[in-house]
Amino acid sequence: MRTPNIRIERIISHGQSSPEAGWYDQDEAEWVILLQGGAVLGFENGKEISLQAGDYVHIPAHCRHRVVMTDQEEVTIWLAVFYCN
């Protein structure tokens, strides 16, 4: 789904991670929930958040982040809602 102020995406990962220099720096805020699997998100300030199915996180616009890892044993399914104010 996509409108001028909101975009919803389902993302499927299986053992992927962002490249070492691959920081996301988005114009939109992002709310993401893990529906299945596991993942670790890393932030430019050095903080890491481990996520399991049912966990969610809000990422403000321009908060540089990356996917450190996703589960290699099980498919990881994300539901991401990107939005602008």
Regions found by a protein language model. Name each.
Residues M1-W23, V81:
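A short glycine-rich, His/Asp/Glu-containing loop-to-beta-strand
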Residues Q16, A53-G54, P60-H62:
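Tight coil/turn sites that cap or link beta-strands
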Residues H62-N85:
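Ligand-binding loop in jelly-roll beta-barrel domains
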